[in-house]
Regions:
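Short, basic (Lys/Arg/His-rich) helix/loop patches that form interaction surfaces
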Residues: 191-229, 233
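Short, charged phosphate-coordinating catalytic segments
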Residues: 119-142
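Basic, Lys/Arg- and aromatic-enriched nucleic-acid-binding interface segment
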Residues: 98-127
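DNA breakage-rejoining catalytic core of tyrosine-based enzymes
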Residues: 77, 88-103, 151-160
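N-terminal core-binding DNA-recognition domain of tyrosine recombinases/integrases
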Residues: 2-90
Length: 243
């Protein structure tokens, strides 16, 4: 980062005093962010400016924004971050942590809820996607599941541990079949809730379990672009917070 600060200063036609001012502000920026540019480190830096007078904040933010744009132009950043002055202390959101999902395999009488939880936590499906899964979407020979959402279709590998939970659901039209019809969203919510409550993890909502799937995939080295395809999303916008 120090080399890039020097390169940035050299790229500007400014006086010696201005060079010193830019260098001081950017070195301070580097120390606070530890050379890492992401939403959390930038928010931390913005918070350090809260005690300064507006004019000083404006000067430092201008220097940093110019530097960030320089890094973006030089291909050192995937996107351009533009900082604004904070008007009040902000809470730094901690990045969610990967949790141990082994309790999902607990032997239970709530098999519907358990299967729903496994499909969310280990395949990243949403309850609405699970509700639309048909028996024809499941291929046990190749251990894959086809998920169709609108005009998009994706084929997901099924972890072998989940196969036994699906093999007994091949008698109807849908994997979760109500006499040839799908169950309501409320039914899926209730089944999931009763299962996670029974294992002492009532905080494991569908959203939380899907987030755990995302975090687990990122930990394995998957890129956001790969996750967009796996999750059937149109863009990576909703995944940016996990970078």
């Amino acid at each position: 980062m120090k080399d890039w600060i020097a390169a940035f200063i050299r790229s500007k036609s400014i006086s010696s005093n201005s060079q010193k001012s830019y260098t001081y502000d950017l070195q301070q920026f580097m120390e606070v962010t530890q050379g890492q540019v992401n939403q959390q480190t930038l928010l931390t830096y913005q918070q350090t400016l809260l005690t300064l007078k507006p004019a000083a904040q404006k000067r430092k933010l201008s220097a940093v924004n110019q530097f960030l744009y320089f890094l973006y132009e030089e291909g050192q950043l995937e996107r351009f971050y533009k900082l604004k002055a904070l008007t009040s202390p902000a809470t730094i959101k901690q990045r969610p942590q990967v949790e141990d999902l082994s309790p999902l395999w607990t032997e239970t009488a709530f098999l519907d809820g358990q299967t729903i939880a496994l499909l969310i936590g280990f395949l990243g499906l949403t309850p609405s996607e699970i509700a639309e899964l048909t028996v024809d979407d499941l291929n046990l020979d190749f251990q894959v599941l086809t998920v169709q959402k609108g005009q998009t279709k994706r084929v997901l590998d099924i972890p072998k541990e989940i196969l036994p939970y699906l093999e007994n659901r091949l008698t109807g039209v849908y994997l979760f079949d109500k006499k040839g019809q799908t169950y309501s969203r409320q039914w899926f919510f209730n089944r999931l809730t009763e299962f996670v409550s029974s294992i002492g993890r009532s905080d494991w909502t569908a959203q939380k379990l899907r987030e755990q799937y995302i975090l687990g995939q990122i930990k394995q080295g998957k890129s956001l672009d790969q996750l967009v395809k796996q999750l059937g999303l149109k863009s990576s916008m909703s995944l940016e917070k996990y970078k």
